[in-house]
Design a protein with these regions (language model features):
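Non-transmembrane
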Residues: 1-436, 458-462
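C-terminal helix/juxtamembrane-tail motif
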Residues: 427-428, 442, 446-462
Length: 462
């Protein structure tokens, strides 16, 4: 027993030593990158695995991939050569040794940005990975032209890879931006940029941020630059977090600062399907992204004052939509206190509202959903699987910014008079001939009642 106690004391001492090192003057890590849990990954593991390039310690060494196009060691070495050539144009004495030493100083900060400790990776392996992966990302996203860092011509994904085709460019963007595990801290990219040009740190931040905004606009996910919501950091933790920063609703239904106990204790449980809401008289309307100041991204769902129309920004679904949404959810699952749960709340909403083929068909007709899949059933299945395995409390206003909207819609659905009127409108009044017939029958009934009343009155007067 004494041996056991001694062993536990040693481990506690080691643990306390590790905690002390985190706060010994090194920068705190704002965004933690963790391994996707099996419960979530098992729904569709391909949505979390890289197809073109493996980045970061979770994918080191090169993972076993079904894709034959995964970037090899020589591809990343070629990127290092391009970055070094650009650096020597500004600083002729620049060497690889300088990069290695500078990144070695960031090793502890970088390791603190991951949920795993990676004790099996030596310092040399870890720094080597950071340097090669960082150079690969910068050379692809920023671009290297004529042996200098061309940060003034970021452009589109197609233009950022001068020697490859559009498909390769899109594959790079997908892997380095969209995947939760496939990340290295943003400050590593800034450090490499700082060593490469005189003002490289600021320029890397500015131009990669512009690149991300252009990407979100072209995919129709967001239209405006990020709006900072405390306590979220101003500087992105990694590239996926940079995309996440663009997805903030303009106005929250309930302020996150409001204690749960002060909110109306009505449980929302879950959203009803689009067809159920439609049966209760709720209309769905596509909300235009052109409403400047009123809508910033696809999360800006709005219920009109009367509660009869739910305005939802159009979700343009392509082959990468599910991958991006799933990985954004994973980012929030790991960093809820820092980044919130807005994307998760939106995904829970849209996945429950559009969970059947008829729901997708209805929302497609209203312009809320646009997709290029083979059929609506396939899209409905993807929506139904979107939030499997996640942890989310719909009754917590700090998690669910759409809680008040859900409550109002539920009250409308539970109102029998509204449902009867809605049923009458949908069953009869949408067909003009049926409406005319119903009106004529109603007029005839009223006239018959009037005639009966007059007949009774005349009888008593006699």
């Amino acid at each position: 027993m004494d041996r056991l106690a001694h062993d536990l004391e040693d481990k506690l001492a080691s643990l306390n030593s590790s905690k002390a090192k985190v706060g010994d003057g090194h920068r705190p890590c704002s965004i933690i990158v963790g391994k996707v849990r099996d419960l979530t990954r098992n729904v569709d593991s391909s949505e979390y695995d890289p197809d073109h390039v493996a980045i970061g310690p979770y994918n080191y060494p090169r993972p076993q991939s079904r894709s034959p196009h995964l970037a090899m060691e020589h591809d990343k070495l070629a990127s290092l050569d391009l970055v070094l050539s650009a650096a020597k144009a500004a600083r002729p004495t620049m060497t690889v040794e300088v990069y290695v030493k500078e990144l070695a100083c960031l090793e502890r900060d970088t390791r603190n940005c991951y949920a795993n400790t990676f004790d099996d990776m030596t310092s040399e392996q870890f720094v080597r990975m950071l340097l090669l992966d960082g150079c690969y990302i910068l050379s692809r996203l920023v671009g290297l032209r004529a042996h200098h860092l061309d940060l003034d011509d970021v452009g589109t994904a197609e233009a950022s890879v001068s020697s490859a085709n559009r498909a390769e460019a899109l594959a790079v963007v997908r892997d380095v931006f969209y995947l939760a595990e496939n990340q290295i801290p943003f400050f590593v990219l800034e450090k490499i940029g700082e060593l490469t040009t005189l003002d490289g740190k600021d320029r890397v931040f500015t131009h990669i941020s512009d690149y991300a905004l252009d990407l979100m606009r072209r995919q129709k996910y967001a239209t405006a630059a990020p709006a900072m919501v405390p306590p979220e950091p101003i500087v992105p933790g990694n590239l996926l977090h940079l995309l996440h920063m663009h997805l903030k609703p303009v106005a929250l239904s309930v302020s996150p600062s409001v204690p749960v106990s002060t909110v109306d204790p009505v449980y929302v449980r879950r959203w009803r399907s689009a067809t159920e809401y439609n049966f209760a008289g709720v209309n769905f309307k596509a909300r235009a992204m052109s409403e400047k100041g009123l809508i910033r991204c696809i999360l800006d769902v709005k219920l009109d004052v009367g509660g009869g129309t739910l305005e939802v920004p159009c979700l343009d679904i392509d082959s990468e939509t599910w991958r991006l949404l799933r990985n954004l959810i994973e980012l929030e699952q790991r960093n809820r206190e820092t980044v919130g749960s807005h994307v998760t709340a939106y995904c829970v909403f849209i996945s429950q509202v559009a969970c059947t083929t008829k729901d997708v068909e209805l929302l497609s007709k209203r312009g809320v959903i646009v997709h290029g899949h083979g059929n609506n059933e396939e899209v409905a299945k993807c929506f139904a699987d979107l939030c499997k395995g996640i942890q989310f409390d719909p009754d917590d206003p700090s998690c669910n910014y759409l809680r008040e909207t859900c409550k109002k819609l539920e009250k409308r659905f539970q109102s029998y008079p509204r449902r009867w009127i809605a049923w009458l409108m949908q069953r009869y009044l949408r067909n003009p001939w049926l409406a005319v017939g119903l009106l004529a029958a109603a007029i005839g009934l009223v006239l018959a009642l009037i005639q009966t009343v007059y007949s009774v009155l005349c009888y008593y007067k006699q």
